Design a protein with these regions (language model features):
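Feature captures hydrophobic
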Residues: 1-154
Length: 154
């Protein structure tokens, strides 16, 4: 009843989500939304996708490694990615001849890496130069978020 009586949208949403969680749990949400590749994500530009990649990267998996990646996007600008001790930096239109890895992909291939979808990674991304094991380590460093966590229950 509190959810229907609250005037504030934020309070109303909190009460109604809590009631839904108590009745149904948190496992009833669509699986596609958990992957982070919905229409909103597909509409992001390359820089926003790379920012997202930097956010979800598990820095502890690559904390002892430093390498560079030439990212050639077939439908957007090219980027130089530098990974130094688990921190991802990117530079627009700054490819390097000395990069450890060169990959080519459409912009949506960035989302394939962030979602960990190996089928789409194989389909969309081409390793032009460099060690494929390094590319796999880069892909494996992406953390999988649990988007649907409990709001009111511990």
């Amino acid at each position: 009843q509190l959810g229907y009586q609250a005037e504030s949208g934020a309070w109303r949403n909190a009460y109604l989500v809590a009631a839904f969680e108590l009745r149904n749990g948190t496992g009833l949400y669509p699986k596609a939304a958990q992957l982070g590749v919905g229409t909103t994500a597909q509409g992001m530009d390359a820089q926003t996708m790379l920012d997202y990649m930097g956010i979800i990267m598990d820095t502890e998996k690559l904390q002892d490694r430093s390498f560079t990646i030439n990212l050639k996007l077939t439908d957007a600008d090219d980027y130089l990615l530098k990974l130094h001790h688990g921190v991802l930096l990117y530079y627009k239109d700054a490819l390097s001849d000395e990069a450890d890895l060169t990959i080519s992909t459409p912009r949506i291939g960035i989302l394939a890496i962030t979602s960990g979808n190996q089928e789409n990674i194989d389909k969309l991304i081409t390793v032009e130069k460099g060690d494929k094991a390094l590319f796999q380590a880069f892909c494996d460093s992406m953390a999988a978020f649990d988007l649907y966590f409990n709001i009111i229950e511990p």
